[in-house]
Amino acid sequence: MPFACRGLLFSLEHAKVASQLLARLFGYAQSAGSPVAILKGLYMGLFIGKTVIITGGGKATLKDGSAGSIGYGIDIAFAKEGANLVITGRNVAKLEAAKESLEAEYGVKVLPVQADVSAGQDNEAVVQNVIDQAIAEFGRIDAVVNNAQASASGVTIADHTMDQFNLAIYSGLYATYLYMQKAYPHLKETKGSVVNFASGAGLFGNYGQCSYAAAKEGIRGLTRVAANEWGPDGINVNIVCPLAWTAALENFQDAYPEAFKANVHMPPAGHYGDVEKEIGRVVVQLCGPDFKYMNGETVTLEGGMGQRP
């Protein structure tokens, strides 16, 4: 069964030779377990030999077995382009599961690093450890995707506690700031890219989302400043505001069907975004060569719900 890679068709019997050739051309290590793994599912090979840090990149799946979180969807999208990945999160088991699946399926290298940016932690040291491990393992950083965020949803401003507010600010705004700052010298060397994550909660002031919205709008401001400061260094920094079908929404629908109907609305597109194909692929493009001129922008991926003047 033939498949395409960089515009060429390869039959399975030629895949081993092709894999060896690509390894020599682009300097990546072949997967010992599968010499054709680097070709399987590869789109254009945009990130072969490059390194991407993805926060919140642990594995999550839907009931049908497909990717069930935005972070894992982004993992897959970059793996299909041949990127080596540094994935972070608090849950070691989910990180290790992502590593196992991605390496087996796509032949890329994945470095999982437990990282918890929260109140009471030495957050600079936590983030610096991620950067140091990335450089020690791969020698370069080409893109940083700041996806991870925790928050207390459904709590009004009047009822919000400082602990709840800090949860959102530390895990979102502070984490994004620290990953950007610590990665900057390496991104400058590679003329890399940053994609940060914001939300319609901030754009439209969603009820019960005060700390989450505040963190996300802070991230948008930080992104615009970075676009101006780092543009001359060849680094572009953009924002994605996604709406996607995730395991969390699937579980919410199963557990509270009436609440789901009342609070989760179908976008005009008629479906919720696919975390890999409709969110992850856009993130890949924002970090790729064709979108280097896009800088400081907010991209809403909400199937028509995120329309703004």
Walk through the language-model features, giving the residues of each.
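Canonical Rossmann dinucleotide-binding motif of NAD(H)/NADP(H)-dependent dehydrogenases/reductases
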Residues: 45-86
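Substrate-binding pocket helix/loop in short-chain dehydrogenase/reductase
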Residues: 155-157, 161-166, 260-263
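Catalytic Tyr-x(3-8)-Lys segment
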Residues: 116-118, 257-277
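Active-site helix of classical SDR
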Residues: 180, 215, 223
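Residue(s) in the substrate-gating loop at a strand-loop-helix junction
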Residues: 199
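Short, small/polar-rich loop/turn modules that mediate ligand/substrate recognition or access, typified
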Residues: 231, 236, 294-296
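Short C-terminal tail/terminal secondary-structure segment
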Residues: 61-63, 154, 204, 265-266, ...
